[in-house]
Curated annotation (Swiss-Prot):
The protein's role, per its UniProt record: Acts as a component of the auxin efflux carrier. Mediates the initial auxin gradient which contributes to the establishment of the apical-basal axis in early embryogenesis. Together with PIN3 and PIN4, involved in the connective auxin transport (CAT) that ensures communication across the shoot system, and modulates strigolactone-mediated shoot branching control. The abcb19 pin3 pin4 pin7 quadruple mutant exhibits an additive phenotype on strigolactone-mediated bud outgrowth responses and shoot branching control.
Protein known as: Auxin efflux carrier component 7
Effect of a null allele: Plants display altered embryo with defects in stereotypical pattern of early embryogenesis. The triple mutant pin3 pin4 pin7 is able to suppress partially the highly branched phenotype of strigolactone deficient mutants lacking MAX2 and MAX4.
Organism in which the protein naturally occurs: Arabidopsis thaliana (Mouse-ear cress)
A GO molecular-function annotation: auxin efflux transmembrane transporter activity
Gene of this entry: PIN7
Subcellular location: Cell membrane
Binding site for (indol-3-yl)acetate: 51, 112, 114, 145, 579-580
């Protein structure tokens, strides 16, 4: 039976963690002590030094020869059960998807064991439960986070191959990834170079593109500073520094537009860009061609852009997907006149001599490298046509797009999305592209099967990318070195030198509080605590605090755990969401809003929920 003294002991261990988190939150939101840049520096210190040294401290001081194999087996079985069910759901049901499988797996099986689990379980069930939590931390860092990274890289590789080689993916027999490419997470603008070998198979080289990506609608990296745009309904996020290899500059652009004095402060979209609105039945004719005529520009028309969140257009030498591209100029006016379900604005411009110009294809901004071939030869060498749609935002930040896909072009856009390889879609709660041909299934259309390279080729590519990510992660080194030292120290009874031990201890002692402080800073910097909507947040919390513990209870009883071991296993599964899965979700843009809500809101409600589990299991 749980006594009031037991509850007080638990609160004594956990409340100080929340005090650190609340202080950090108030320092940013209420007292304005820290700026976003200062918060970034604190988070950097926590990620590189505090948390890795905290992991090393716990792992190196835990006896690996006294590990409870049945407890580890129960934890492993829980994750394998969830993984198996999600794989079946993703591959054999219409509603399944790889993105949601990864998200649900993260929510249900990867709690915040290091920061919350160790102090909470020690207060509840004694020092031995703390040793069990350290064993879970070791498995998480070495096995399960690596598996999660493997799934994210598999998704990135699948998108890359489907978009670059939609028809010839099965013919790829090798990938060579240049050393500066560290991930397929979509943040780097990648390009592929395919060569046909003597055997008729494709040998692909993946490298970074010279063009830097510009991201729209908040889909960019952490270095992007939001600035309001005077383009109607658009919020443009621009990098502070000029991208590498870019010879595009704004002075040349505005001079080309006919403004010798540079950028004017009071220009409007109609005066500068000749934005055509699709709101009316007949769009106003553009005067952009008249302005460009003074610069001897070639003729051009609007062609539907690529899918948001996509890689560069497929290589025409190895894909037959460009057959529909020749119809684009004829469909231009039909597209504009009919697409009246949203407030999309069209923007077209030419940029001369901008081989490395910062262009985003994630939000529909696309550079037509072959524009001169399509509209006739021009004496303006190196001209690139930039085409994009800018849609107005509603008050809550969502575009006025079609009811299901949230893209930029309404009904016509939904028809164009069907032509994207394997029916890529955008989710409503974030800008993640799904890999399932949902529209084709709903409409009963038949879509061509997109063949993937052999499993051995895909596995080698993914392992290369996972390895490059792991060797750049400080937690990888701290976990492995801590485990190796524990194996040596407890096998031959070797003590760590006092100087090294005290040097590690002085930083690791601050790790727990700094980790919670960093989490509070993260909460304060978010515009909303619930970023993905109430219904989605409710679903995420149900998966985190009910599905995970339920599956763990089944797995633990199947292994034969009883008594306190069973209680520790269930309470451990009901801890708040782990931070590392959220970091991965943000890097790969797979439901980051859901994982953010799981971390923030889950931390707020975790204490009463775990106390309820503690009381019920103690009856």
């Amino acid at each position: 039976m749980i006594t009031w003294h037991d509850l007080y002991t638990v609160l004594t261990a956990v409340i100080p963690l929340y005090v650190a988190m609340i202080l950090a939150y108030g320092s940013v939101r209420w007292w304005k002590i820290f700026s976003p840049d200062q918060c970034s520096g604190i988070n950097r210190f926590v990620a590189i030094f505090a948390v890795p040294l905290l992991s090393f401290h716990f792992i190196s001081s835990n006896n690996p020869y006294a590990m409870n194999l049945r407890f580890i087996a129960a934890d492993t079985l829980q994750k394998l059960i969830m993984l198996t069910l999600l794989i079946i759901w993703a591959n054999f049901t219409r509603s399944g998807s790889l993105e949601w499988s990864i998200t649900i797996f993260s929510l249900s099986t990867l709690p915040n064991t290091l920061v919350m689990g160790i102090p909470l379980l020690i207060a509840m069930y004694g020092e031995y439960s703390g040793s069990l939590m350290v064993q879970i931390v070791v498995l998480q860092c070495i096995i399960w986070y690596t598996l999660l990274l493997f799934l994210f890289e598999y998704r990135g590789a699948k998108i890359l191959i489907m978009e670059q080689f939609p028809e010839t993916g099965a013919s790829i027999v090798s990938f060579k990834v240049e050393s500066d490419v560290v991930s397929l997470d979509g943040h780097d603008f990648l390009e592929t170079d395919a060569q046909i070998g003597d055997d008729g198979k494709l040998h692909v080289t993946v490298r970074k593109s010279n063009a830097s990506r510009r991201s729209f609608y908040g889909g960019g990296g952490t270095n992007m500073t939001p600035r309001p745009s005077n383009l109607t309904g658009a919020e443009i996020y621009s990098l502070n520094t000029t991208p590498r290899g870019s010879n595009f500059n704004h002075s040349d652009f505005y001079s080309m537009m006919g403004f010798p004095g540079g950028r004017l402060s009071n220009f409007g979209p109609a005066d500068m860009y000749s934005v055509q609105s699709s709101r009316g039945p007949t769009p106003r004719p553009s005067n952009f061609e008249e302005s460009c005529a003074m610069a001897s520009s070639p003729r051009f028309g609007y062609y539907p852009g690529g899918a948001p969140g996509s890689y560069p257009a497929p290589n025409p030498e190895f894909s037959t997907g460009n057959k529909t591209g020749s119809k684009a100029p004829k469909e231009n006016h039909h597209h504009v006149g009919k697409s009246n379900s949203n407030d999309a604005k069209e923007l077209h411009m030419f940029v001369w001599g901008s081989n490395g110009s910062p262009v985003s294809d994630r939000a529909g901004l696309q550079v037509d490298n072959g524009a001169n071939e399509q509209v006739g030869k021009s004496d303006q060498g190196g001209a690139k046509e930039i085409r994009m749609l800018i849609s107005d935002h509603t008050q809550n930040g969502e575009n006025k797009a079609g009811p299901m896909n949230g893209d930029y072009g309404g009904e016509e856009e939904s028809e164009r999305v069907k032509e994207v390889p394997n029916g890529l879609h955008k989710l409503r709660c974030n800008s993640t592209a799904e890999l399932n041909p949902k529209e084709a299934i709903e409409t009963g259309e038949t879509v061509p099967v997109k063949h993937m390279p052999p499993a051995s080729v895909m596995t080698r590519l993914i392992l290369i990318m996972v390895w490059r990510k792991l060797i750049r992660n400080p937690n990888t080194y701290s976990s492995l070195i801590g485990l190796i030292w524990a194996l040596v120290a407890f096998r031959w009874d070797v003590a760590m030198p006092k100087i090294i031990q005290q040097s590690i201890s002085i930083l690791s002692d601050a790790g727990l509080g700094m980790a919670m402080f960093s989490l509070g800073l993260f909460m304060a910097l978010q515009p909303k605590l619930i970023a993905c909507g109430n219904s989605t947040a409710t679903f995420a919390m149900a998966v985190r605090f009910f599905t995970g513990p339920a599956v763990m209870a089944v797995a633990a009883m199947a292994i034969g755990l009883r008594g306190d071991l069973l209680r520790v296993a269930i309470v451990q599964a009901a801890l708040p969401q782990g931070i590392v899965p959220f970091v991965f979700a943000k890097e790969y843009n797979v439901h980051p809003a859901i994982l953010s809500t799981g971390v923030i809101f889950g931390m707020l409600i975790a204490l009463p929920i775990t106390l309820v589990y503690y009381i019920l299991l103690g009856l």
